[in-house]
């Protein structure tokens, strides 16, 4: 794969300054955007630049990229050696019934046709929202802890030991699951049972 860090003149590391990355992208994107650049390969270069930016701004894809660039773990073997950490399995066991409860509530709500049936669901709505809020708080704490680990990895990255590369791979796996779970439990995606005023 091409080194996305090199496209922005950055050293390959687990942590990068998001503001500096954004500025570097804006500067380079303006120079190679097809609308302002007549060169025949401008569109391809802009697409490549955008893909590199998307890779680097997300800590999960950035870590995956670093693991691949290190050459320590061949790309085709990454999926085989990446197992789900035990702590995530335990956490998922707690998330699963909450998501099931949310799904059940949404089904009941969509089937409710009258203001009375909606009103009868308000207690269940509050219960589901409370459970989601508690779990969301835990997941955000786990995400913050993962960000701290990202900084720790960055401090030792130049060592490039196999153990360090493996830690990066495991952290990417954990953060990917956290991203997915946090997105799936967003409270603002839960419709209210309060009927709309006539």
Predicted regions and their residues:
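C-terminal accessory/regulatory regions appended to core domains
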Residues: 1-198
């Amino acid at each position: 794969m091409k080194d996305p860090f090199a496209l922005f003149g950055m050293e390959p590391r687990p942590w990068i300054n998001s503001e500096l990355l954004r500025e570097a992208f804006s500067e380079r994107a303006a120079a190679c955007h097809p609308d302002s650049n007549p060169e025949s390969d401008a569109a391809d270069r802009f697409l490549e630049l955008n893909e590199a930016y998307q890779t680097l701004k997300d800590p999960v894809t950035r870590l995956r990229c670093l693991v691949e660039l290190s050459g320590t773990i061949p790309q085709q073997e990454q999926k085989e050696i990446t197992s789900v950490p035990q702590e995530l399995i335990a956490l998922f066991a707690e998330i699963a019934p909450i998501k099931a409860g949310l799904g059940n509530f949404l089904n009941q709500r969509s089937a409710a046709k009258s203001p009375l049936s909606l009103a009868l669901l308000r207690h269940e709505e509050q219960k589901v929202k409370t459970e989601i809020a508690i779990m969301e708080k835990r997941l955000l704490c786990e995400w913050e802890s993962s960000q701290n680990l990202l900084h720790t990895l960055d401090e030792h990255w130049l060592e490039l030991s196999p153990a360090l590369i493996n830690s990066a791979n495991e952290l990417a796996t954990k953060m990917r699951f956290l991203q997915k779970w946090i997105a799936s439990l967003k409270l603002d995606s839960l419709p209210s049972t309060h009927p709309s005023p006539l």
